[in-house]
């Protein structure tokens, strides 16, 4: 009997999804207008778009119908490798990083040597959520503490608990919010963070409207715009050791939607945070597109730490990337173009959003890094604080070609990674 009820529920959900995807005329009361403004190189006065083309992000992940994709996923007929139901983690309890500073209101300007030695610690919480700590400034990316990635408590269930319990989070000063998909914009988590810490939330155009609907203020900016961060009192107004901290909203290649009628009503983005010891780059969620956006981010200054996605890229056997999500080989190319000193892979091993196996993304990343002859971009454990080394000599600005990467990774060891 339970199986019958499950089949009925799946059928009803399938019909609902099919009806939603089939609608071509959306009544006004069903639409969501998050942003209004003049036309630009990526906004047509109604919806945002990727200036390097949207063909790859608009197509269904498998090249078939969206209804068929959802049906196969819901019924388990998509041939995906089995994931673990739960992954053990050791949650961190990160202490505040304190740098000896003069008592307020007297602040010094750091010398170049002092700035370069500024401590930085990053803790991967899971998926795209990372806590980055420098003295007096705690930064959180796309915070999601929810058990499910989807509306109303539905959607993929997380297999790894957050790497930091919410109660153990230090004071959060700054939140970077890349776009409005449920696995990145979790209103329940954001509401708790706002109530507790009153952080500055920086996002791209339109996403602030979603937050305001829940009483959460946010600062929205367009690509190529910047927001100045005012640190806590021990840091100084608008300065960090006498240097301004700015969040640059930068381009990537993705799309946005909270449900079927609001596609691309809000903008997606990556971010560069200028810090005295080297910049922080957060890629958000992204496909490769024209591949120039990492170079644009690198032009803002040396990148000490890059947070780069490596998962949710495979929807057919052997696929190494999708239009909306880079896979590990492309992630290595992004790392090379950023010329980052260190990178942490994110967007894998937390929510099952595609067809690759649980250990496939880090396995492919290791192989791709070996093919590129690079170091500095390797998986870290959820909940394990990682000290980020200072910026050293800038990496050579070369990128491993697609042809070299494909040829090098055509091995039995890679082919068994489903």
Question: Can you say where each PLM-predicted feature lies in the sequence?
Answer:
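Cap/insert and terminal regions of metallo-dependent hydrolase folds
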Residues: 3-37, 43, 200-202, 206-209, ...
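Acidic/histidine-rich helix-loop elements
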Residues: 143-162, 255-263, 314-325
């Amino acid at each position: 009997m339970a199986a019958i009820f499950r089949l009925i529920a799946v059928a009803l959900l399938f019909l609902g999804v099919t009806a939603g995807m089939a609608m071509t005329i959306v009544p006004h009361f069903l639409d969501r207008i998050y942003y209004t403004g003049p036309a630009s190189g990526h906004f047509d006065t109604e919806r945002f778009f990727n200036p390097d083309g949207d063909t790859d992000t608009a197509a269904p992940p498998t090249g078939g119908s969206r209804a068929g994709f959802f049906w196969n996923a819901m019924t388990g007929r998509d041939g995906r490798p089995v994931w673990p139901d739960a992954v053990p983690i050791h949650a961190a309890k990160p202490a505040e990083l304190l740098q000896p500073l003069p008592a307020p209101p007297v602040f010094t300007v750091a010398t170049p040597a002092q700035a370069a030695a500024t401590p930085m610690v990053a803790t991967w919480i899971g998926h795209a959520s990372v806590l980055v700590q420098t003295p007096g400034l705690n930064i959180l990316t796309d915070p999601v503490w929810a058990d499910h990635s989807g509306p109303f408590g539905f959607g993929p269930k997380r297999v790894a608990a957050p790497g930091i319990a919410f109660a153990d989070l230090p004071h959060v000063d700054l939140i970077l919010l890349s776009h409005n998909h449920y696995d990145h914009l979790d209103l329940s988590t954001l509401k708790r963070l706002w109530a507790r810490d009153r952080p500055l939330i920086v996002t791209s155009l339109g996403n602030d409207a979603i937050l305001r609907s829940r009483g959460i203020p946010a600062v929205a900016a367009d690509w190529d715009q910047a927001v100045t961060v005012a640190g806590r009192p021990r840091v100084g107004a608008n300065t960090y050791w006498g240097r301004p901290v700015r969040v640059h909203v930068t381009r990537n290649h993705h799309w946005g939607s909270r449900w079927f009628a609001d596609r691309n009503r809000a903008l997606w983005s990556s971010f560069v945070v200028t810090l005295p010891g080297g910049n922080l780059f957060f890629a958000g969620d992204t496909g490769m597109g024209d591949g120039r956006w990492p170079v644009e981010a690198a032009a803002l200054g040396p990148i000490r730490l890059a947070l780069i996605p490596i998962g949710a890229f495979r929807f057919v056997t052997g696929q190494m990337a999708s239009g909306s999500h880079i896979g590990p080989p492309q992630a290595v190319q992004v790392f090379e173009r950023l010329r980052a000193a260190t990178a942490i892979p994110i967007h894998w091993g937390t929510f099952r959003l595609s067809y690759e196996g649980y250990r496939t993304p880090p396995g492919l990343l290791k192989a791709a890094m070996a093919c590129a002859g690079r170091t500095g971009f390797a998986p870290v454990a959820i909940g394990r604080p990682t000290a980020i080394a200072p910026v050293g000599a800038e990496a050579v600005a070369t990128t491993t070609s697609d042809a070299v990467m494909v040829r090098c990774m055509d091995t039995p060891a890679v082919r068994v990674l489903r």
